[in-house]
Amino acid sequence: MKSTENIEKSSIFEKLFKLRENKTTVKTEILAGITTFITMAYIIIVNPNILRFAGMNLPGIKGEGAGAFTALNDPVVASVFAATCLTAAIGTFVMAFYANLPFAQAPGMGLNAFFTYSVCLGLGYTWQQALAAVFISGILFIIITLTSIREKIVDALPQNLKLAISGGIGLFIALIGFKGGGIIVSNKETLVAFGSLTSPSALVTLIGISITAIFMARKIKGSILIGIVITAIVGIPFGITKLAGVKIFSAPPSLAPTFMQFDFAGLLGSGAGKGLFSAIMSVVMVVITFSLVDLFDTIGTLVGTATKAKMLDENGRVKNMNKALMSDALATTAGAIMGTSTVVTYVESTAGVAEGGRTGLTSATVGVLFLASLFFSGLVGIVPTEATAPALVIVGVLMMSSITKIDFEDFTEALPAFLTIAIMPFSYSIANGIAAGIIFYPIVKVATGRYKEVSPIVYVLAGLFIIRFIILP
């Protein structure tokens, strides 16, 4: 009888993923994949819950309160659920078999908020037009990955701005979570205020934040997903979680309501209620924002995780970085086709890497589990906004951690970074935050005679953003 070691040496997994070269085993990789999936599975619940506010549901059932989100009765929301699972599986499989890296992909937190609250609710685009913009950004990402443009853009933006973008998005999605859970409400005199903390919505949300925070502090795997599940259960006696007519197991939902639902004519025409030139400039800004956030989010995750796992090559670069970025670009394009927002490489991949995941077998395992999730669409219908709100707050905390690396001692670096972080939640727009940072960076550098520290690409981007604000005030 062959030993386990000999079996692994001759297995298809060895041939596909070079396990011995990466000093790992089939068992280790599969367990790492399960760990990664558990930590990021919340996205299959949260993503449809955010995109529904962009209008990705049946007319007349948009609602803001508890129980408004019922995937079982809404084929459009169910389609977004299916698109989320399929896109995550496709992107992660490409990462597995093309890049042979242990990183998982799915529609990005922050970018789904940008899609909903900035592009659709803020600029007035329909979700079909927004999906067209995501598709364009995916194609653009493919092109810049095939050329040297990617490296030039990455090198052009200051490191402090890259860190600020992540931190600002964290603050922004935390605000969305607080608002969705009824903890923060609008106020005419003070703009925002505490909601009624004794209301069922706020109580369930606060309990959910506390539970998830405890799990995170104790470093329990799958803390966010477990927190969502427990919070949904807590919501039952409060009347927040509705169980009537729920079927946990079901056939995968149809993609028809969101598949290939692009409106390019509306996007480039009068989709935002502006003239042709203004509409085109608006689209350019939207596409640039989608592309930049996706680019830096993915690169940050890849570099940070690979560094901790000692997966860098002799030049200090992530192995197969270009292939990983191509996986991300292809997944974003596929996601737009199926009906979801921009795909990114998930920072939760670090959980699987910490468990020993070193190859594409880890990500292949994650992909299989996302496909299996298609048969549990009924679970999405159970989970209310109050149960996913804590997840947004906790993810916001994780994303905000990047600001500790910003150089606040240098005012010419601190001001643009601060504006990027602050303006995102205060203007309810990720794009505005990025624009503010990029515009003020060359201003303060030139004012102090340090204009040579600014890349020509940043000057161009700053000019484009200024034009955008003049045309679309």
Language model segments and positions:
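Hydrophobic, aromatic-rich alpha-helical transmembrane segments
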Residues: 22-33, 73-81, 85, 106, ...
